[in-house]
Amino acid sequence: MSNRMWGGRFASGPAEIMEEINASIGFDRRLASQDIRGSLAHVAMLGSQGILPAEDVAAIEAGLKSVEAEIARGEFVFRRELEDIHMAVESRLTEIVGPAAGRLHTARSRNDQVATDMRLWVRDTLDALDAQVADLQRALAETAVKHAGTVMPGFTHLQSAQPVTFGHHCLAYVEMLARDRGRFRDARARLNECPLGAAALAGTSFPIDRHATAAALGFDRPTANSLDSVADRDFALESLSAASICAVHLSRFAEELVVWTSAQFGFVRLSDGFTTGSSIMPQKRNPDAAELVRAKAGRIIGALTGLLIVMKGLPLAYSKDMQEDKEGTFDALQSLSLCLAAMAGMVRDLEPVAETLKRAAGSGYATATDLADWLVRELNMPFRQAHHVTGRVVAAASERGIGLEELSLQGMQAIEPGITDAVFAVLGVENSVASRTSYGGTAPDNVRRQAAAWLEKLGPVEK
């Protein structure tokens, strides 16, 4: 079937397989709202510049709003032979308003049109993601307040290292997510330039006002170079990069939840709302939500890698390869949205098992550093010497199969005669975490202050 939008040069329509590989309407239909917003701004500018007569502008504006309403009601028919959302909208507009619709594309190409649509969609999505990340931060900070004093093991190499609190652990993710929000906002600031009016690649001879269309669409300014305007997909790459880093953070937390909910750890419980059962093993409660967040992180990272590979060999300006920017970008950013919603729900649903956490915090000689610090403070011992002495004390306790706090004073003094019974005050896990009062440390009062500061900064949930 001949394509009415560009078929004049061709004696026949495309081969069926060409039509299939060429069409993007199956996925770029989600740009409909942005496409119509861009067209409304464009036609208003054409009218104000005297390029189109007022009656055509009015007809086109009314027709575009009718198309938008049809799409919203689910009545719009998306046809593959029209290739993409731009042609689909223009074709229906022509049916509604007649030949005047053909004037809409004056001083515009699909190259600058799709670049504008994509920037609008990514910008809208980044704004929504920022709000979701803030909600997850809020959930974590609220949990940190409740569990500022709940002792748990801190790990390095997935081995017990030093006691921390559950609240402190939650606040670590609040900080990571704050950086994610910064990256989303940086990406948004850089993408907020409008390519509309760059036309195919060289600009246009019509007296358009690109500053007017940029302002109408909420952009800070028009893009400065017409070639770059249509060739650039940095805005998608940067957004996918920020999304990938955020997904890595979510995946790390999801991995911890998978481990922590296992019978072997038993650190936290998730409700039925975020777990599933087994078709054969009736006892199972599987942390599927966390596992899916972990898996979707790979999908998001894959979208970034895929688009980098698409773009790496493209000469200026536009190539059809760039049509492949959409599916990965759409899927990745919407997958991240789903992951953020799931994680916020799981965090609010989490039930830490305090006794199990405390017991685990005391295992693995996690207060050994506290002993070394005590030797430095009380015996004025150089830290390297204190480290060596503490290692010998740990070895002595390990040989007896007991904890540090269970080793007798005589046993310790056999290694270092200067040790007194005052040392036992620092070997308990509560005393250990309480002593970590340095800025950013795990002391419960620190955690409460930082969590409160975050909640004040984040503000109430937006309705």
Curated annotation (Swiss-Prot):
It holds the Pfam family Lyase_1. It catalyses: 2-(N(omega)-L-arginino)succinate = fumarate + L-arginine. Coiled coil: none annotated. The keyword Amino-acid biosynthesis applies. Pathway: Amino-acid biosynthesis; L-arginine biosynthesis; L-arginine from L-ornithine and carbamoyl phosphate: step 3/3. GO terms for biological process: arginine biosynthetic process via ornithine; L-arginine biosynthetic process. Its EC number is 4.3.2.1. GO terms for molecular function: argininosuccinate lyase activity. It is found in: Cytoplasm. Its main location: cytoplasm. GO terms for cellular component: cytosol. It comes from the Bacteria. Keywords: Amino-acid biosynthesis, Arginine biosynthesis, Cytoplasm, Lyase. PANTHER family: ARGININOSUCCINATE LYASE. Belongs to the lyase 1 family. Argininosuccinate lyase subfamily. HAMAP family: Arg_succ_lyase (MF_00006). This is Argininosuccinate lyase. It comes from Methylorubrum extorquens (strain PA1) (Methylobacterium extorquens). The gene is argH.
